[in-house]
Structures are given as structure tokens and as C-alpha cells.
Amino acid sequence: MINLIKIGTRSSKLALYQANLVRENLKKKFPNIDYSIVEIKTKGDKIQDRNLDRSIDKGFFVKEIQDSLIEEKIDIAVHSLKDLPVENSSIIKTSAILERGNHKDVFLSRSKKKLSEFTKNEIIGTSSLRRKAQLLNINPNLTVKDIRGNVDTRIKKMINGEYDGLVMAAAGIERLGLEGYISEYLDVEIMLNAPGQGAIAIEINSDKSEIDKIICKIN
């Protein structure tokens, strides 16, 4: 019988929000089980001084959490689905995906301007090559620069004047209650989101059938 489930997650505000959302969903179904949050630093959290698209490799934001799962330091791993590698593993598996949040990207700006109102003298920050390519497709004269850090860190950089605008995932902004910074939601016709964006995935060890029976109930 399972009495405690250890939930592994990154340590950012957004990651902790998502891990706690998983915990609350599990509590509703299994109130007699105890749950603990285990914070784990990933390579993506540690490397903050390089362009993300040049630094990224398989499992950039999840490998250390998956390693802790395989080593049974945690019982389940909570990820943003878009961060998971495409390749399947025989050792671990996705047991559940929570109801998907907003899949769109949003544009944030200090001046509350919309993207169409931006000029080449104003700097837009993004860590994503996908977003940069689409921004320049919308307007080749836009100035787009790399930005790193968690959601709140990026917004602080914008407020402090390092950037005039940002393109980010709507789900993360909404989950942290930061909608007040949104200038507009970007339709997928002009800014196609990442696969799985807005969804939260829960991984387990493939041979843990008892855990699987619990976690799949919140799928």
C-alpha cells in the first residue's frame, strides 16, 4: 500500500505551481496518501548565460528529474509536456497528462503596445528560435534578442527596461496570475505554438504498476 508519493519538479515558481496542481488533483482522488514536493535543478536551470537554442540538447529541462525518478529518489516527475524529449523510453513512461491549459503564445509589452505597433527601435525578447523566426516573418524590421530566466525574471527584465516586449507561453503567464502584463494573445495563424504547449505531463517508472493505477486516475 502506498502511503507517500514524492513529486519531483524544477524549482521555478511556475514548475512548483504545476507540481502543486498535480498534488491537489491527486489529493482529491486519494486523500489518505501523503504527498511531498522534491525540487530538482536541471541543466536548463543552471545554464543562464548562453543562447537556449544553441545550448539545448535532449532533456535539457528534464534529464535530472528523470534520473531521480529512475534512481527512485522520487515517485513521479512533473514536467511541462513541451519540454519532454520526443523519443520514448522503456524505463519511464508518461502515466497522465492534466487537462491542457491555454496553448497560445502571448505578447507582453511595457507600453501596452500590440506587436503590430512595435518599431525596429524597440527590443523584443524571446529564448525560442521558433518564436524569433515567426516574429521576423511578421515584420523583418523587428529587433529580436535572446532572453533567459524564469517567467518572473523575464518580466522583471522588461519592467527594468532591458526589453520593450516579450513573447511567452500564455499558460505560464495565466498560471502565475500575471495576465496584467499581456498586451495581446497571438493567434496560431501568426505565431504557431510549440507541440504540447500548455499541458502538464506526469512520468513514472514503467515497472511501478501500483503508482500507475493512482496517477492514471487524474489523466
For the regions a language model picked out, list residue spans one by one.
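Domain-level signature for soluble enzymes in the chorismate/prephenate branch of the shikimate pathway
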Residues: 1-219
